[in-house]
Amino acid sequence: MTTLQERVAAHFAESIRAKQEAGKVLVEPTVQAAELMLQCLMNDGKILACGNGGSAADAQHFAAEMTGRFEKERMELAAVALTTDTSALTAIGNDYGFDHVFSKQVRALGRAGDVLVGISTSGNSANVIEAVKAAHERDMHVIALTGRDGGKIAAILKDTDVLLNVPHPRTARIQENHILLIHAMCDCIDSVLLEGM
């Protein structure tokens, strides 16, 4: 029988392996995603972010790092999590269905050249899929953070979008990689803005 200590140690070991595997395929796409966001922000655009559950928390975490700061003081950057307005979420959910809680906001707030960060560990969240479609209608770029095989979201992305797919079957490991990717993108953005890299 496995002890609790062994279970915890196994989590650490699996998390390390999952990050190492993701690092083999996601360094270049992560840089592309950061550059896409930088281009948007330098042209007075904004970043909209969405997801469900833990991915909603990641969307909010990312928006907070942009509007506040990541690790260094810098100007505020325009980013909005579409997961925080309970009145909008419940009104849209009630009147149009939960699948549309993000897409209606994207259509209302998104403009050509803006970026949508859509987060879904399965790649199959219906409301994130609808948000991606709405972003495309608005001539926005999409950065999709997914897991497993990328799901339906990976299939509808355009060549100008960026897929950050964590190739792991376990949701916890995907989520841990998503926050690492978010922090890496924040660091890239700060490095360019503050150090001219």
From Swiss-Prot:
Quick one: which pathway?
Answer: Carbohydrate biosynthesis; D-glycero-D-manno-heptose 7-phosphate biosynthesis; D-glycero-alpha-D-manno-heptose 7-phosphate and D-glycero-beta-D-manno-heptose 7-phosphate from sedoheptulose 7-phosphate: step 1/1; Bacterial outer membrane biogenesis; LOS core biosynthesis
The note on cofactor binding and number reads: Binds 1 zinc ion per subunit.
Its recorded reaction(s) are: 2 D-sedoheptulose 7-phosphate = D-glycero-alpha-D-manno-heptose 7-phosphate + D-glycero-beta-D-manno-heptose 7-phosphate
Pfam families found in the cross-reference section? SIS_2
- Which EC numbers characterise this protein's activity in its record? 5.3.1.28
Q: List the disulfide bonds.
A: none
Compartments it resides in:
Cytoplasm
Other remarks? Answer: The reaction produces a racemic mixture of D-glycero-alpha-D-manno-heptose 7-phosphate and D-glycero-beta-D-manno-heptose 7-phosphate.
Q: Which PANTHER family match?
A: DNAA INITIATOR-ASSOCIATING PROTEIN DIAA, SEDOHEPTULOSE 7-PHOSPHATE ISOMERASE / DNAA INITIATOR-ASSOCIATING FACTOR FOR REPLICATION INITIATION
Family of the protein in this entry: Belongs to the SIS family. GmhA subfamily.
Q: What is this protein called?
A: Phosphoheptose isomerase
Query: Which organism is this entry from?
Result: Neisseria meningitidis serogroup B (strain ATCC BAA-335 / MC58)
Upper lineage: Bacteria, Pseudomonadati, Pseudomonadota, Betaproteobacteria, Neisseriales
